[in-house]
A protein has these predicted regions:
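Substrate-binding pocket helix/loop in short-chain dehydrogenase/reductase
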Residues: 86-87, 91-99, 189, 203
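Active-site loop immediately N-terminal to the catalytic Tyr-X3-Lys motif
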Residues: 88, 135-141, 163-164, 210, ...
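Active-site helix of classical SDR
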Residues: 110, 146, 154
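Short C-terminal tail/terminal secondary-structure segment
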Residues: 135, 223, 234-247
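Short, small/polar-rich loop/turn modules that mediate ligand/substrate recognition or access, typified
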Residues: 162, 167, 233-235
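Conserved glycine-rich cofactor-binding loop
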Residues: 14-15
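Residue(s) in the substrate-gating loop at a strand-loop-helix junction
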Residues: 130
């Protein structure tokens, strides 16, 4: 695919999967905008400070991109947080944080770009799901709730906007070597008094491929989902999890 002059917004693209996707799209010739609260430390794309928990910040950031570029071709709504806790261990504040960022932040980001893509009569959107969009895991009640919601948001939005040639798909990674994973590992190690290396090794052994994934491996799938080469695919939840959910 010719990526030249394609304009893409990625939320949460300073670290992890968002960063890997930003770098890959930039290297392929895209004009990339990173909406994040922490600025990236390289020159691969433009940074706009945006906390996706704020509806107004999202709308202002999208307006800033559209004013400059006159179009928005693609969106990867990636920003999110993880929480390793069961229901009794979860505070009211943590529930609010996860729902506001993972669900509402995604919803309002998509809502802000949809009118632009409708006017263009074309657009491609990828939402960040999880293996927990398909299966349950222990100590993940609120996080799993948010990722199940993202799966349904993907399907409903895909149906609503297919007549406008806007495709909406969902990438559902498994266990990936990101800062979010290491925070979860740290918390689990603290709770269980197990060494962090032991926890990480246990994560490797439960994957059919025998290892956790790398951000670049997910970025390559996201890039395909965003691309015009994927023009007949919409409303799909795509696993990239080393075979975890098929066990």
């Amino acid at each position: 695919m010719n990526w030249q002059n394609k304009v893409v917004i990625i939320t949460g693209a300073t670290t992890g999967i968002g960063k890997a996707t930003r770098e890959l799209l930039f290297d392929n010739g895209c004009t990339v905008y990173n909406f994040d609260i922490i600025e990236h430390d390289d020159k691969k794309g433009s940074f706009i400070k945006c906390d996706v928990r704020s509806r107004q910040m999202i709308r202002d950031a999208v307006h800033q991109v559209f004013t400059k570029e006159k179009k928005i071709d693609m969106l990867f709504a990636n920003a999110g947080i993880h929480l390793f806790a069961n229901m009794e261990e979860t505070t009211d504040e943590q529930v609010d944080d996860l729902v506001t960022l993972n669900i509402l932040g995604t919803f309002f980001t998509v809502q802000s770009v949809i009118p632009i893509m409708k006017a263009q009569k074309k657009g491609s959107i990828v939402l960040m799901g999880s293996d927990q969009s398909f299966v349950g895991k222990g100590s993940s009640s609120v996080y799993g709730l948010t990722k199940g919601a993202i799966g349904q948001l993907t399907k409903s939005t895909a149906i609503d906007y297919a007549p406008y040639n806007i495709r909406v798909n969902c990438i559902c990674p498994g266990t990936i070597d990101t800062p979010l994973l290491h925070k979860a590992v740290d918390r689990f190690a603290t709770i269980t008094s197990k060494p962090q290396l032991e926890v990480l090794e246990s994560l490797n052994t439960i994957q059919p491929l025998g290892r956790i994934g790398k951000p670049k491996e997910i970025a390559s799938v996201v890039t395909f989902l965003l691309s015009d080469e994927n023009s007949f695919m919409t409303g799909s939840l795509v696993s990239a999890d080393g075979g975890y959910v098929c066990q």
